[in-house]
Design a protein with these regions (language model features):
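Membrane helix-loop boundary segments at the extracytoplasmic
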Residues: 618-623, 927-932, 965-1004
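Long extracytoplasmic/lumenal interhelical loops at the membrane interface
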Residues: 866-880, 892-932
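Noncatalytic carbohydrate-binding groove/subsite architecture in carbohydrate-active enzymes
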Residues: 162-291, 334
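Aromatic-rich peripheral "rim/lid" segments of glycoside hydrolase catalytic domains that contact
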Residues: 41, 136, 145, 150, ...
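Alpha-helical transmembrane segments of multi-pass inner-membrane proteins
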Residues: 527-551, 562-572, 576-578, 591-598, ...
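Transmembrane signal-anchor hairpin modules in multi-pass inner-membrane enzymes, especially those
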Residues: 5-17, 21-26, 495-680, 690, ...
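A membrane-periplasm/extracellular boundary helix in multi-pass inner-membrane enzymes
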Residues: 542-560, 580, 627, 648, ...
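Glycan-recognition surfaces in beta-rich domains, encompassing non-catalytic CBMs
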Residues: 353-522, 526, 530-533
Length: 1016
């Protein structure tokens, strides 16, 4: 039985984990587009009647128009959408007057679609027509739609252009609002299509292009056409290549990405096509039966009401498409060519009579909503509803959902709202001794502002009644609106918890019987590995031997053994350059494949290449319409190569490596703790996307680099090579900057016109930060003497040191010149000279003081004493704001890469308004505390303590001059990290993060360097 459980436990753990992942993916798919919780109060209110229908009644007789509109109104529709075609000197104002008058008489609202056969060529004349139309009907029409399907060549009149349509909106939008101050201007309904031009443009892409061209300010609501095509409204697949009702969500997501989430998204045409109802059917819109058409239509309305608070009016296509019985759009029609009602309109009328105005759906609703019933005495305006001073002040609001909130105007006044839901106290409000739930309207800070207050949640699905009684608060316009939330009915909680329980139970059993489970897994892995190894070895061997035959005509692996260092370094460098500079995707991919093979053969060289390209992350490689940092690509390739080596050699791991993996050093534990806390901090981030990105590129990938240095067998030569390549990368940064400075390009003018070098970085301060990490290493290694170093190599270190120092000097980085570099040089002197360090230290101190005195009048130095406007003033304000930020979130911090949003949105001092876009605290202690909380600060302190303890022990005990000076250089670099980090960035840039992990990983590896390791 025990053996059976040992066999079943891994299977149960894996299966339950897969089930959990599948459930979460399905849940994400199901709720996509569904606004969870209470909708944002900035969202525009939903129309009380959200259903409309397209009509084509202009050429009809007055009797037919009146009869048709009366039938539409009696069905329960609140809107009709009519297209008005304009041609120069050919518009029929009389017919338009007649139609609009009948619309108003039948208690309907009209969406007036203004369009023409060739709008782009006559924008000014068309704009004049739109102004005249809005001016003429401003008392009868409030909703105007400019054009229709501009993403199709057939509607736009020529190749579609989002820029042209954006310009049209920019021209006409202000004219309509000038003529009709209550107007709602709709963007043209975008036709759903998967084409990407040139004749037709994907509706999702077209909307993205509209926002990119600046159209956001020139429409009040967006518009799409969520036809169902061949599937029902509960087809929840979402893709640019899929046409279905859910495609509407993709348009909404584009709006949110563009920061336009406060507007509603209207459906100017939607429905399902029944080809049997058309004399001349088309397959363009898919095909369903009449029964499906009815059921799908009602289900779509239900879904939009219950899931999409951002959905505006849904306009069916159509009541009837006109007098032409051969029009293929009869397949959408609610009536037949003979005038009889179809099945859809009959069932729809029954549905609307019950649900249309019975309860407020998911969304935002204005104070004057028809779902709200007020006692006598209330006043209403654009500000909301004002509490009466005399008499009752009650509100009854009927809604359908699981959450309810009030949008109120709070301020420096005394008022109380007493609320009950379904005759019970509201579960999110405090309760008086009398058992009444209440909400105080006095603002905590006494400022006047509009706020959404959650009232109740976890309500049963269905209709609910909220009763509100106000005590005081008149003349404040306290009630602004109502917010209704509706949690998804799709609940996976119990199944997920069950699967999680099985997963944890199986894992617990495996841990308890770890030895037996490990034996079983090792047997299984060896069984499959023996069979997979043959295939992998055969494939890789073929590639290697073909490459050898085509290039050098000799055994490729022999070229990569440690006795021949030039070939692997040269080939790897050439492959890296080919990947980076190649304009052809195929060559880039082939180069990446070659690099993967090379990294597999020599992972130690991979580490050196990563160290080399660290500062060049700002110049990513474009592939697959994305940008990839070379540092990131090389790190992931090296990780993949090491994993491949371990998988292939799993059955023959040496005892040393196995035991090493089981013995984590204190520094390893500190780094893993830091990474874990960083991952956890994502949960506290308001800007989740920014936090995840920073975790990936500034925490996870640098930690991967640290782990690679720790697990790859490395010799002393390998460690020195990694540090040398790190110095070479910094040297290249310095050379590029010096050339730019000589040519007078890519410079920044500081105080009094001082030109500052910035090389490849966006700021001169980044030059000082990065070169400050590499300069101590170059200086320390230049102190080596023969026979431990050749004259040429020592000269190279000296030249690199001089170039980097000059580059730092020309960057005028005060943090580097006044703190970082002096502190690092002091460390080198004391570590290298020991008891004889006093004299050279005094010389350094004298030189530093002399330079400070000489340059004290320099604008970059003199500005430090400005306590009212200079950098010191702004730093003090920034640090004070950061302390307040930490005080509010001492445990979790504000999350990775959320400093900017928290600082700019809440904590910035009014005196520091000139520079709101600061993304870090400019202090190593405050920065880690603000991002990760005090536990995060403790983790970095643990890392630094362990680092210096290890480094000091190595410096005092090692007998190898090269390793001793390498350790001194790395220690001085870390001291630069601390000193410069007191006033500027420390870790939270990609290059600084990799430099930090490189420094601590090499220090740790020096303690167990393997002089006999070979990366073969």
């Amino acid at each position: 039985m025990r053996r059976v459980l040992i066999i079943l436990a891994p299977a149960v753990a894996l299966t339950s984990l897969i089930v959990i992942v599948v459930l979460l993916v399905q849940y994400r798919t199901h709720i996509r587009g569904h606004s969870l919780g209470l909708p944002n109060p900035n969202l525009d209110p939903r129309p009380s009647n959200m259903l409309g229908v397209n009509i084509e009644l202009l050429p009809e007789s007055p009797g037919t128009i009146d009869k048709t509109l009366n039938a539409i109104s009696n069905t329960g529709f609140g809107w009709v959408r009519q297209t008005f075609y304009w041609e120069p000197e050919k518009f029929d104002w009389v017919a338009t007057d007649r139609l609009i008058n009948f619309v108003i008489e039948n208690n309907l609202q009209i969406i007036a679609v203004l369009t023409s056969s060739n709008i782009p060529d006559q924008t000014n004349k068309f704009a004049q027509f739109a102004y005249e139309f809005a001016d003429r009907y401003s008392d009868q029409v409030d909703t105007y739609q400019l054009g229709d399907e501009p993403n199709l060549i057939s509607a736009w009149g020529r190749t579609p252009s989002a820029v042209e349509y954006s310009n049209l909106l920019a021209t006409i939008y202000p004219l309509i609002h000038q003529a009709d101050t209550n107007a709602t201007v709709l963007m043209a309904g975008l036709a759903p299509t998967t084409e990407n031009g040139p004749e037709n443009i994907n509706d999702i892409l077209y909307l993205r292009q509209l926002y990119a061209s600046g159209a956001k300010e020139y429409f009040d609501a967006a518009s799409g056409k969520p036809y169902g095509f061949n599937t029902g409204p509960n087809d929840r697949r979402l893709s640019n290549s899929i046409l279905n009702f859910s495609r509407f969500i993709l348009l909404r997501e584009e709006m949110e990405k563009a920061g336009d989430s406060s507007k509603l998204l209207w459906a100017s045409q939607f429905g399902w096509y029944d080809p049997s109802a058309a004399a001349n059917p088309q397959t363009t819109w898919g095909a369903v039966s009449d029964e499906q058409q009815t059921n799908f239509t009602i289900a779509a309305i239900e879904r939009a009401r219950g899931e999409w608070p951002w959905a505006g009016v849904l306009v069916l296509d159509n009541y009837y498409p006109g007098i032409d019985i051969h029009n293929p759009r009869w397949g959408f029609a609610l009536t037949t060519p003979t005038g009889a009602n179809g099945k859809t309109i009959t069932d729809l009328k029954n549905y609307l009579s019950v649900y249309q105005l019975s309860a407020a759906p998911h969304g935002i609703h204005p104070a004057a909503s028809p779902y709200a019933q007020y006692s006598d005495g209330w006043s209403f305006s654009n500000l909301g509803a004002d509490i009466p001073q005399i008499g009752d002040s009650n509100i009854t609001f009927t809604f359908e959902g699981s959450e309810f909130g009030l949008i109120v105007r709070r301020g420096n006044y005394r008022a109380t709202l007493y609320v009950e839901i379904d005759s019970e106290p509201a579960n999110l409000l405090p309760i008086t001794q009398k058992g009444e739930s209440y909400q105080i309207l006095t603002a905590p800070d006494l400022s006047t502002h509009v706020e959404l207050i959650p009232i109740a949640n976890n309500l049963k699905p269905g209709k609910h009644i909220a009763k509100i009684r106000a005590d005081r608060g008149w003349n404040q316009w306290a009630i602004v609106g109502f917010s209704v939330g509706n949690e998804p009915a799709y609940d996976i909680t119990f199944i997920t918890l069950g699967a999680l329980f099985l997963f944890l139970a199986a894992c617990g059993y495996m841990i308890y019987n770890l030895k037996s489970v490990r034996t079983f897994l090792n047997d299984m892995i060896m069984y499959f590995t023996n069979r997979v190894n043959m295939l992998i070895t055969l494939c890789l061997g073929t590639v290697f031997w073909i490459s050898a035959g085509m290039t050098w005509g000799q055994n490729l692996p022999q070229l990569f053994v440690r006795q021949n260092e030039f070939v692997p370094l040269a080939v790897t460098t050439i492959s890296a350059l080919a990947y980076y500079v190649s304009p052809w995707l195929l060559l880039s991919l082939l180069s990446l494949t070659a690099l993967l093979i090379l990294f597999y053969l020599r992972p130690d060289v991979a580490l050196a290449m990563i160290a080399l390209v660290i500062p060049f992350y700002l110049y990513p490689k474009p592939m697959f319409e994305r940008m990839f940092s070379t540092t990131e690509v090389f790190t992931l390739l090296a990780t993949a190569a090491v994993l491949m080596r371990n998988i292939i050699n799993l059955s023959s791991l040496s005892p040393d490596i196995s035991s090493f993996r089981l013995r984590l050093s204190s520094l390893d534990k500190a780094v893993l703790t830091f990474a874990t806390l960083s991952l956890i901090s994502i949960l506290s981030a308001n800007e989740l996307g920014a936090a995840i990105t920073e975790f990936r590129v500034i925490v996870l990938e640098p930690v991967l680099f640290y782990l690679l240095v720790r697990v790859i067998p490395l010799t002393r030569t390998d460690l020195v090579r990694i540090s040398d390549y790190f110095v070479i990368g910094a040297f290249l940064v310095a050379i590029i900057g010096l050339i730019q400075y000589t040519l007078g390009i890519n410079l920044i003018a500081a105080e009094d016109g001082v030109l500052r070098l910035r090389s490849i970085f966006g700021s001169p301060n980044n030059v000082g930060l990065y070169l400050g990490r590499a300069l101590p290493l170059a200086i320390a290694m230049s102190l080596l003497s023969q026979p431990y170093i050749s004259k040429l190599r020592r000269a190279a270190y000296i030249v690199a040191s001089i170039c980097m120092f000059v580059a730092i000097l020309l960057s005028f980085s005060r943090g580097a010149l006044l703190l970082g570099i002096p502190a690092a040089l002091t460390a080198i002197i004391f570590y290298y000279k020991g008891k004889r360090a006093i004299r050279p230290f005094l010389v350094l101190l004298a030189v530093t003081c002399t330079i400070l005195i000489v340059f004290s009048s320099h604008p970059r130095i003199a500005s430090l004493t400005d306590q009212t406007h200079g950098p010191t003033f702004f730093r003090m304000n920034l640090w004070n704001s950061t302390i307040n930020m930490i005080a509010d979130s001492p445990i979790t911090g504000v999350g990775l890469d959320n400093f900017l949003y928290s600082y700019r949105g809440k904590y910035i001092s009014p005196d520091a308004w000139q520079d709101p876009n600061i993304s870090h605290a400019h202090n190593v202690i405050l920065d880690f505390s603000a991002r990760l909380g005090l536990p995060g600060l403790a983790s970095i302190m643990w890392i630094l303590y362990t680092f210096f303890k290890t480094a000091n022990r190595t410096i005092s005990t090692t007998m190898d001059p090269k390793l001793r000076l390498l350790t001194i250089g790395l220690t001085a670099s870390m001291i630069n990290f601390i000193a410069h980090g007191l006033v500027d960035a420390s870790y939270w840039f990609i290059d600084l993060a990799f430099a930090f992990m490189l420094t601590i990983s090499i220090i740790q590896r020096i303690t167990n360097v393997d002089d006999h390791a070979e990366s073969t």
